[in-house]
Each structure stands twice: as structure tokens, then as C-alpha cells.
Amino acid sequence: MGVGKTEAALAAAEIMASRFSLGGVFFGLPTQATANGIFRRLLHWADTQSEEVPQAIQLAHGMAELNENYLRLQGGRVQLEEDAPEEHQVQVHQWFRGSKQALLASFVVGTVDQLLMAALTQKHVMLRHLGLAGKVVIIDECHAYDAYMNCYLDRALEWLGWYKVPVILLSATLPARRRAELIEAYQQKHRLDPDAPWRFSCGYPLLTWTDGAEVKQTVIPLDTPGQTVQLTPLTEAELPGLLRRKLAEGGCAGVIVNTVKKAQKIAQLLRESLPDKEVQLFHAQFLMPDRAAREEQLMERIGKDSVPESRNDLIVVGTQVMEQSLDLDLDVLVTELCPMDLLLQRIGRLHRHCRSRPKPLQQACCAVLDTGEEAFDAGSEAVYGQWLLWRTRKYLPRSIRLPEDIAPLVQQVYDWEQEAPETEQGEKLRSEYEQMQEKKKDRAGKYLVPQPEVDEDFQELNTLDDWMQNVGATSDAAARAAVRDGDPSVEVLVMQRRTGGSIHFLPWQEGGSAVAADSPPPPETALKIARQKLRLPAVFGKAWKVDEVIRELDADDRRWLAAWQLSPLLHGELVLLLDEDLTAHLADMELCYDRENGLEYRKEEKDEGDRI
């Protein structure tokens, strides 16, 4: 964690592209936020890769057209620096901007879905294979996918191995068993020794590679000092007192929990208990512009180059978005109990950079927020299930030596097959977990492309025609949904409808300016509206709720904003209209948007008259 995996991957990609005469790089990341974060870094790197011709670059995910860095590059070649030589340029070419052609550009940054869809039977899948076949493929945070997504990742790796495409997989917390599965997928033409030592290595940082015939490994020595992190158990009631003591002489704290609702609850508790501290929220249920502004502010205040004046007395309460997308440097960390690999990712934000810290915070300390009872937090259980939480709680030590303990701790939690039978409760949780994993794999297998198989006489070759007999997704949006498990998510554009019926941006967005509702907005205004995007909480996407949600949103849009559907940028979008108090009623839920807290919701209370 924090040892330069990205820079090492790009250096390796440059060497392999030169050695094998490849024409570009695909960089896949788990979320749109992480893809946006790496895009700027890859721009500068890609700009140095050719001294003769401009290179095409693409940002490939569902909201790429709303990314300001990406938009500024559209319309031809753009110099990244004012004094850059004329020949050192990158470009976003119009031809590559369609979803079908995006992977054909020389350099592509996107969500991992773009790679997973190469393993999905859908129309034009051959263009994805064509785009990937001439590149070096880099996948970051490859531990971050569930059993469902892993089925598509493994099948994609089988085809990339068949094409002899170099693949670089990055993770700081990858279990050894999963590492072996990834290598076996890529090497599927070759039988690998099931007892080979590389399968069980626990070094860190560990480099594992294959030359097509055998698997090799080396532990890379670090020239940076390690550290010991003290772990302490904590309940929610004890949290304010702990932070009061730890921040008595200044410094900043991070509190990472597993659900947005829990983050909002904790933030309110801390604001009431610690009025002399500044409490900031950071989670996924902010409008895109609000989240971007918060991210930029947090990077300035507690990022790598922050100063004590900006850090002191700041508490950031967030969710999993703090695990992956932000290079934060926290003086003290509180994390809710989560699977061990993710807990270690969170600890990677603690004392991340060398700096002078207040005396009470010079020893790295992480408090693990738990219920204090045998049962798990309901929200955590809904996100991660009970088995991995149970295993993590069982093996959680009193202190962690970084980086020495990273791999052994991950192995302890995930390598349960080598252990003696668990307690009756443990066996029950394990059985439930394994059954759920098998169900995920079964669902994923329905629309997987076949494996690459051919006999010695090339008589039994799988062809693209064979793949199309059972097309799994007919649109790009449907394909993205098909490679991720779970209920569909509902995304909305958030605007305000004031007394009298006028439509406005929220008061702090675009100055709260009004937008005509009876005609399509001009392109510049439509782009600003399209950026007011928000993903509704998961409850609104549940099978028993989603149809009602979409029906009500669509009815309001037809009534008030029908003309907006004539705008290319807004066509097909759902708009959530808030009232003067920034609240709305949707599918028996009351929603409220707040600039500091993001979107909150609760079930509507019906009076007695409604029950008759």
C-alpha cells in the first residue's frame, strides 16, 4: 500500500509495449471515481510515449462525458503544458467516442466493466477483443470484485492469455488462492503444479509473473521504513471520547464506515459531541459537483502536501470511497469492522506520508468499530455478509506490522480450507457463504462467452458466430449491469421546482439559476444539468421497489419536463425535483438533500386517516 504500484505498472507497460510491438494501454479500475483519478496521471504519461504522432486517449465509463479533464481534451489535439513541444500531444478523437469503438483508442482509462464486457455475449463484442488484443492491460485493485464479477474477469483473462496480451494485475491485499486463480485463468492452456511454492507465498511487496511456461516470484525490498499500527476495539458510544483525547493537541482523524446511513449518523453524533471540531462527510450520495468539490478540498487539507494549519481539528467521516479513490494522510483512523483485506486498505490511509504529527498521534493507531456483541451491525452484514466479518473478527490482532503482516493476515481470513472444522456457528456461516458464492457464479455463467478452445488441426475453434447464439445484453448500459451483480441502480438528475413551477439548479449550483422547462435547454446548459447526477440509495433499486420508483419519476418528468427529452444530453434521463425545502416524496419515501450531508431518506409516516 502506497509503495508505487501504479508507477511500476506503467513502467512495465512501457517496456512490454516496446518489446512486443504493442500499440497502447488499457487501464481498468473498480469505480468511476478511481478511473477519473488515474485519468489525469495517464494523460501525462501517454504524452511521453510517442515523439512522432499524436496518440488517441479515451476515458471509458458511463459518465465520461461529464468529466471536465476529458471534455477539455475533446475537439482535437490539446497540449498538456503551455511550453510543451508541438509534437508531444494527446488527443480525444471523435471517432473513438462511441461505446463500441472506445477500446480501439491507443490509451484507454475506464472502469473494469469495459474489460469484463469482453467476456459477455453481446453484440459487437469482437470490437472489444480487437481493442484489447493490441494493448498492455492493467487492472488495479483486482481484489475488489465479488464472485460474480470474477467469473467475467477470469474468462476475459483466458482470452487475453490466448492472444498473448501482457496483463498487469495490481493489489496490495490479494489472497493467495485468488492470485492462483487469476494466473490459472491466464495460463489456461498449460497445466500448473497444484503444490508449487508460488501458490502459498506471503511476501510483501510480492511480484508474481509468468513467461508462458512457468510461474516465478520475487519479493521486492523496500527502502522505506515500516511501521506498527496499534489496533483497539471500539463501540459507537466510545467514539467521541476517543477522538476528543486523540485530537487534544491537533491533528486530523478519519472515520470509515460501511454504509452511507451509518456515516451520516456518526457525523451527526460527532458534531453534537465535539462542537469544537470540524466534521466533514464524504460518501457516494452527493451530487457529482458536490462530491468533486469535497474531494478536492480534502486532498488540499489532508492530502500528501497538506500543512498542519489545514489538518488540525478536522474529522472526515466517510464510506468505502475513502478506501480507493483518495490519497489521504490521516493522523488517526477509526474503521468499522469489514473484511480483512478491505480493513488493511483503510489502514493504508493512516500515516501514509512522512510528516511531523502531534505528540498523541505519533504512534499509528486504528480503532475498529464493532457492536461489542456477538451480532454484527445490520448494515455491515448487508454489505459483506457474516462469514468474512466473523473471520476478520476472529483473527484481528492487537497490532499490525506494515508491510510484513499484510499478506499473512489476508491469508488467515481467506484460507479457511486448510483449517480444522469451525464451531457450529462458524460452519453454518461458512456453508451459507459458499452457497451464495456458487449462486453468484451460476448467475454469471449464463452469458459468458465460451473458453478459447481449438484442437491440433484447428477443427474445433470457437468463433464469434458461436458466441452470438445467446446474446446477453443488447445495449451498453445493459452490458454494464450484466457484469455486476445485484439489483439495478437508479440514477437521477437533481433539480429544484420552486413555488410557481419554475425549475432551478440547487441554490449553490450555478447560482441557483432558472432553466426553462418548456423547451430543450441549450447544449451548454444541458451539460450543466447532466452533471447534477446522483445515484439513489440501494433500497430504491430493489426488485419490489424499482418499478414504482421509475414510474413516479417518469410521470413527474412527463408532466413538468417533457421538452428536456429533446436534448441529446438529457434524453432518457430521470429528474428528481426537490421542493423549496430541498425535499421530495418518492415511492413512499421522503428524500432530503443537504449540502453537508448529501442525500438522506426515511420511510414516510402515514397518519391514522391513511390507515383506514
Specify the residue positions occupied by each region the protein language model found:
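A substrate-engagement module of RecA-like helicase motors
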Residues: 42-107, 112-116
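C-terminal helicase lobe and adjacent C-terminal extensions/tails of nucleic-acid helicase motors
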Residues: 179, 237, 241-306, 330, ...
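Walker A/P-loop NTP-binding motif
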Residues: 6-23, 41, 157-159
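Conserved two-lobed SF2 helicase motor
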Residues: 101-119, 308-323
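Conserved interdomain linker/interface between the two RecA-like ATPase lobes of SF2 helicase motors
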Residues: 190-263
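Walker A/P-loop
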Residues: 1-13, 145-146, 171
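Conserved Walker A/P-loop ATP-binding site and its immediately adjacent core
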Residues: 23-47, 59-65, 174-178, 260
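Post-DEXD/H (motif II) to motif III coupling segment of the RecA-like Helicase ATP-binding lobe
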Residues: 127-136, 143-217
